[in-house]
């Protein structure tokens, strides 16, 4: 799910010596409509692919390599098809963190970002979120009620994430319930 601290876990694994590819880091994007806010400009898809290839060259491909399960596109860049297809065959460690914990983590991550761009991001997902919920989220943003903004938008992202997960073979999904981010 969104807001479970997946990126932080990847960074912790890397500090412990695990082989990690941070696709969002390479893409300069957090992987959602809100993902590019206050980050450097994204590379071109070609630059992204070159950076990814360079990372892979420095790893032992006979050993596990940890990556975050992403959609084919991260912002405006696309994961190379062969890499994306390989990701789809690998086990998924699905992190279940209490909703309230995820809300707090996302508030901490996003509340200090550019407010206008946060509003624009809500606008980008308004149709999928539902115009009424989008309007409520924009009003909450204006009131700086970030818990409400995150709560409203998480329902969309949870549904989206589960839809993607259903495309995976059930035998490749390992659930982990953790109490906090």
Predicted regions and their residues:
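Glycine-rich phosphate-binding P-loop
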Residues: 1-15
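Conserved NTP phosphate-binding and transfer environment spanning the P-loop NTPase/kinase superfamily
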Residues: 85-92, 96-181
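Conserved nucleotide-sensing/catalytic segment adjacent to the nucleotide-binding pocket
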Residues: 15-86
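Short phosphate-engaging motifs
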Residues: 5, 74, 102
């Amino acid at each position: 799910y969104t807001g479970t601290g997946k990126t932080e876990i990847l960074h912790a694994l890397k500090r412990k010596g695990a082989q990690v590819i941070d696709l969002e880091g390479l893409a300069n994007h957090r992987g959602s409509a809100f993902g590019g806010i206050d980050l450097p400009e994204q590379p071109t898809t070609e630059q992204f692919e070159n950076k990814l290839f360079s990372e892979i060259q420095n790893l032992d491909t006979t050993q596990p390599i940890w990556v975050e399960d992403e959609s084919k596109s991260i912002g405006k860049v696309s994961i190379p098809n062969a890499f994306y297809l390989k990701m789809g065959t690998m086990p998924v460690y699905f992190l279940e963190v209490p909703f309230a914990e995820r809300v707090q983590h996302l508030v901490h991550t996003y509340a200090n970002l550019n407010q206008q761009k946060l509003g624009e991001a809500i606008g980008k997902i308004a149709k999928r979120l539902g115009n009424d919920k989008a309007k409520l989220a924009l009003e909450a943003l204006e009131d700086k009620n970030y818990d409400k903004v995150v709560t409203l938008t998480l329902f969309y992202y949870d549904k989206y994430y589960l839809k993607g997960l259903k495309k995976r073979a059930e035998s490749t999904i390992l659930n982990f319930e953790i109490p906090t981010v």
